[in-house]
A protein has these predicted regions:
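Active-site phosphate-binding strand-loop segment of PLP-dependent enzymes
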Residues: 143-207
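A short helix->loop->beta-strand "cap" motif at the edges of active sites that frequently abuts
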Residues: 114, 188-192, 217
Length: 306
C-alpha cells in the first residue's frame, strides 16, 4: 500500500518470464514447472459431458447444481469414509478464487479479527488473499517435517486470527501436516481452520487424509478437480465442513456472483464419480516423481524422499 492506494506486486509467475528465454535455449527446450498445468488428457467422458449437459443457457446456481454437490458428498464418503451433510457442501470456481476471496468474506463475518495465518512455505495466494481483504498475512514457521509449527504462533496473532490455512499434502513440498493438531489448535483458540486438500489424491505416504476426519466444527476443507482430473481449465472445486461457516459463505458468494459455469459443473459430476482415471493419473505421477528423484539424487548426491 501507499498514499495512492494498493499497488499490486509483480505476479509471482510473471517474475519467471525473464528466465524462460534462457531455459528455452537448452537442448530439449524448457521444462516449465512454474504454474503446474496438467499435461495429460482428461477423461473422454468428462469432455463428452461438457458438450451434452444443455446447461449453458441458464445461470448456474452459485452453490453448485445438486448432482455436483451429491457427487462431492459421495466422493467424500468413498475417499475418507465420513459423512458430511449435503447442506454443508458447495461449489467454488476452482480453488484459487476461494483461497483469495474467503478472507474477505470471513472478515465481514468477524470484523473484530484481522489476521490470516498460513504456512510459511506455501502457495503465494494465501498471503495475497489476506492482503486483498485488508488483513494481516502472518506466515507460520514450518516444522522439520514440513507441517505448521503451531508453537511459533504468538498469543497476539492467535487472538487476532480470523482463520488459519493448512495445506496437506503441501504445495510445493508434498509434506503431510498433523491435521488433528491443527484442528485442535483452531478449536482451542476459536480460529476456523481452512484445509486446502487439493493434492489429496496424490498422497504418497499412507492413506489420503482430510481435516474433516476430526469433525466439521470450525473446519472447512477445500478440494479441486484441476489436478486430480486434469481439468485446470474448467475451474471446478468445492468446499465442505462447518455448517455455519459454509452457510455464510454460500450466501455471501451468491451475492458476489461466484458461479461455476453449468457445463463445467456437469463435467465435474462425471469427474468426481471417476476414480479409475484418477488412480491411473496418480500412477503416472508417481513414476515421474520416482524418475525425477533418481536424477536429482544422482546429481546432488543426496537421497530424495517422495
Amino acid at each position: 500500500n501507499n498514499s495512492h492506494g494498493f499497488v499490486p506486486p509483480p505476479y509471482p509467475y510473471d517474475r519467471l518470464d525473464v528466465f524462460k528465454t534462457a531455459a528455452a535455449k537448452h537442448v530439449g527446450g524448457i521444462i516449465d514447472l512454474s504454474v503446474g498445468d496438467p499435461c495429460d488428457a482428461p477423461s473422454s467422458a468428462v469432455i463428452a459431458a461438457l458438450s451434452t449437459s444443455h446447461l449453458e443457457r441458464g445461470y448456474p446456481p452459485s452453490i453448485g447444481i445438486e448432482p455436483l454437490r451429491s457427487a462431492a458428498h459421495t466422493w467424500i464418503q468413498r475417499k475418507f469414509d465420513i459423512d458430511v451433510p449435503l447442506a454443508q457442501i458447495a461449489a467454488c470456481v476452482g480453488s484459487k478464487e476461494f483461497v483469495v476471496t474467503t478472507p474477505q468474506w470471513m472478515k465481514l463475518r468477524t470484523p473484530s479479527r484481522d489476521t490470516v495465518l498460513f504456512p510459511a512455505v506455501s502457495y503465494p495466494s494465501y498471503a495475497m488473499g489476506a492482503t486483498l481483504s485488508g488483513c494481516r498475512p502472518v506466515a507460520v514457521p514450518m516444522t522439520a517435517t514440513g507441517g505448521l509449527d503451531l508453537t511459533k504462533i504468538s498469543a497476539d496473532d492467535a487472538k487476532r486470527a480470523l482463520m488459519i490455512w493448512m495445506n496437506s499434502p503441501s504445495n510445493p513440498t508434498g509434506a503431510l501436516d498433523d491435521m488433528g493438531a491443527v484442528v485442535a489448535w483452531g478449536r482451542k483458540h476459536d480460529v476456523p481452520v481452512f484445509s486446502d486438500e487439493c493434492y489429496v489424491e496424490f498422497t504418497w505416504q499412507g492413506k489420503p487424509r482430510t481435516a474433516l476426519e476430526y469433525g466439521t466444527q470450525g473446519v472447512v476443507a477445500l478440494h479441486s478437480l484441476s489436478k486430480r482430473s486434469n481439468l485446470a481449465g474448467l475451474r471446478v472445486g468445492f468446499y465442505a465442513g462447518d455448517a455455519d461457516i459454509v452457510h455464510y459463505l454460500k450466501e455471501v458468494r451468491k451475492h458476489v456472483g461466484m458461479m461455476v459455469p453449468g457445463p463445467a459443473q456437469a463435467a465435474g459430476v462425471v469427474a468426481l464419480n471417476d476414480d479409475a482415471s484418477v488412480k491411473t493419473q496418480a500412477s503416472v505421477y508417481r513414476k515421474r516423481l520416482e524418475r525425477t528423484a533418481q536424477i536429482l539424487s544422482k546429481w546432488s548426491g543426496r537421497a530424495i524422499d517422495l
